[in-house]
């Protein structure tokens, strides 16, 4: 049943109907549409459109419909209704007859869909927050178990300075904490109800919109009807949150793909999150991580697409805005799936400590320590930097690490170097010296783990 047929003398072309209809994706808003309709029925009682008995009948029928939808949401797709609003109204009329036709009084699909989508977004944000914190917790637990796993840290994918696997885990905890904060901020701006704004100019009935917002669990009602039905900032914000969050997960995946490679060999992934080759029997491929990395692109595309859709739209509602849902649903589904999968990857990961430490001892990752040693002896840092560079060239020529160079060879580059340099060049010394807040020293890493556990209530 179309909700707008009286103005037209010809039926819609079937090709246009298929092009125009949105039920195939907005059926996901069924629960929110029904909940919003229950609240609207209560509001209509306050302005005399419905009697208390009529409202009771409508609410009972809507609650039955809600249970039917929860039991089998796919039933909705068997209908040829234009959208979820048409489907809900049609099913309501099936249940209560002519009374069902009174429910839409004073309401437009413009404020209705805006309300439905905000309700759905609020629920989905809470799911994302839960999954985000679960992944943070998994990273903290992995960090706690690997505080003594020394490995090389990289810049430009070249070994740079020694770190620990725990410190690496905690870097991603920080990224995820920012993602969590962004979602919390978005949730605050989501928490205003557009219901009662009508098509664009507000409703003609003196409904208490603040009360109506409270019935739906919103903190307040929106302030401007024209903005309320035009606004899709929350869609852009959530897509932006997802895009940033997926960049973090993609970097996490890329790091672990490299760590798991034969060239690095720092970790072993569980069989539960890897697959094999149809030709090469020895292969164990990090498919879960590669898919996380690959899915990042589709989320970025959803954000870009929505920004382009909205950029030239006049106020208020335009059918272009129907394009908000598919990209949003897919992006947030993808982000949620990837958060869960990243946590699963960490469950069963094995850190190969000897291989990590061997790699950290190569590549002259302790060169900065030698420069700092020279600074402590009174050599200006820029000069110390040059001296150490020359010492590294000599070590490479001899095929030795810095700490294996004889003292006489080191003193060719600076006479201030003494026997006390060798303890300074050990990996543990490199870590211990990074004791300022946020550093990689064992004390700082342990403190960071404790702080994260307290914040996450672990």
UniProtKB/Swiss-Prot annotation:
<dbReference type="InterPro" id="IPR024083">
    <property type="entry name" value="Fumarase/histidase_N"/>
</dbReference>
<dbReference type="GO" id="GO:0006526">
    <property type="term" value="P:L-arginine biosynthetic process"/>
</dbReference>
<dbReference type="GO" id="GO:0004056">
    <property type="term" value="F:argininosuccinate lyase activity"/>
</dbReference>
<dbReference type="Pfam" id="PF00206">
    <property type="entry name" value="Lyase_1"/>
</dbReference>
<comment type="pathway">
    <text>Amino-acid biosynthesis; L-arginine biosynthesis; L-arginine from L-ornithine and carbamoyl phosphate: step 3/3.</text>
</comment>
<dbReference type="InterPro" id="IPR029419">
    <property type="entry name" value="Arg_succ_lyase_C"/>
</dbReference>
<keyword id="KW-0963">Cytoplasm</keyword>
<keyword id="KW-0055">Arginine biosynthesis</keyword>
<dbReference type="GO" id="GO:0042450">
    <property type="term" value="P:arginine biosynthetic process via ornithine"/>
</dbReference>
<dbReference type="InterPro" id="IPR000362">
    <property type="entry name" value="Fumarate_lyase_fam"/>
</dbReference>
<dbReference type="InterPro" id="IPR020557">
    <property type="entry name" value="Fumarate_lyase_CS"/>
</dbReference>
<dbReference type="GO" id="GO:0005829">
    <property type="term" value="C:cytosol"/>
</dbReference>
<comment type="similarity">
    <text>Belongs to the lyase 1 family. Argininosuccinate lyase subfamily.</text>
</comment>
<protein>
    <recommendedName>
        <fullName>Argininosuccinate lyase</fullName>
        <ecNumber>4.3.2.1</ecNumber>
    </recommendedName>
</protein>
<keyword id="KW-0028">Amino-acid biosynthesis</keyword>
<dbReference type="Pfam" id="PF14698">
    <property type="entry name" value="ASL_C2"/>
</dbReference>
<dbReference type="InterPro" id="IPR022761">
    <property type="entry name" value="Fumarate_lyase_N"/>
</dbReference>
<dbReference type="InterPro" id="IPR008948">
    <property type="entry name" value="L-Aspartase-like"/>
</dbReference>
<dbReference type="InterPro" id="IPR009049">
    <property type="entry name" value="Argininosuccinate_lyase"/>
</dbReference>
<keyword id="KW-0456">Lyase</keyword>
């Amino acid at each position: 049943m179309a909700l707008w047929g009286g103005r037209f003398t010809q039926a819609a072309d079937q090709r246009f109907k298929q092009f125009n209809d949105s039920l195939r994706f907005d059926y996901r808003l069924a629960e929110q549409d029904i909940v919003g309709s229950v609240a609207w029925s209560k509001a209509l009682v306050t302005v005399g459109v419905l009697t208390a008995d009529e409202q009771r009948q409508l609410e009972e029928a809507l609650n039955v419909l809600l249970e039917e939808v929860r039991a089998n949401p796919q039933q909705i797709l068997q209908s040829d209704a234009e959208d979820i609003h048409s489907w809900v109204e049609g099913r309501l009329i099936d249940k209560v007859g002519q009374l069902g036709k009174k429910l839409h009084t004073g309401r437009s699909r413009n404020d209705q869909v805006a309300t439905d989508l905000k309700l759905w977004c609020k629920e989905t944000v809470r799911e994302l927050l839960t999954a985000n914190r679960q992944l943070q917790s998994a990273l903290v637990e992995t960090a706690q178990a690997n505080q003594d796993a020394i490995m090389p840290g990289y810049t430009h994918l070249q070994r740079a300075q020694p770190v620990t696997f725990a410190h690496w885990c905690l870097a991603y905890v920080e990224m995820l904490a920012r993602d969590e904060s962004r979602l919390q901020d978005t949730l605050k701006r989501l928490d205003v109800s557009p219901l009662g704004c009508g098509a664009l100019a507000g409703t003609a009935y003196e409904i208490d919109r603040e009360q109506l917002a409270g019935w739906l669990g919103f903190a307040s009602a929106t302030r401007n009807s024209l903005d309320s039905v035009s606004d899709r900032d929350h869609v852009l914000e959530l897509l932006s949150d997802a895009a940033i969050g997926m960049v973090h997960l993609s970097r996490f995946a890329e790091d672990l793909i490299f760590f798991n490679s034969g060239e690095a060999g720092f970790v072993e992934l569980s069989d539960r999150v890897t697959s094999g080759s149809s030709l090469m029997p020895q292969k164990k491929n990090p498919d879960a991580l590669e898919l996380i990395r690959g899915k990042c692109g589709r989320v970025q595309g959803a954000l870009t697409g929505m920004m382009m859709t909205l950029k030239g739209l006049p106020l208020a509602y335009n059918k272009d805005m129907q394009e908000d849902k598919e990209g949003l649903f897919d992006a947030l589904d993808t982000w949620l799936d990837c958060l869960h999968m990243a946590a699963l990857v960490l469950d069963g990961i094995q850190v190969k400590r000897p291989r990590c430490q061997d790699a950290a001892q190569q590549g002259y990752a302790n060169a900065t320590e030698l420069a700092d040693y020279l600074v402590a002896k009174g050599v200006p840092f820029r000069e110390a930097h040059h001296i150490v560079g020359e010492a590294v060239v000599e070590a490479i020529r001899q095929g030795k690490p810095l700490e294996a160079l004889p003292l006489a060879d080191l003193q060719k580059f600076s006479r201030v170097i003494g026997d006390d340099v060798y303890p300074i060049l050990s990996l543990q010394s490199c870590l211990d010296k990074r004791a300022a807040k946020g550093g990689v020293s064992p004390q700082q890493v342990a403190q960071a783990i404790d702080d994260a556990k307290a914040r996450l209530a672990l």
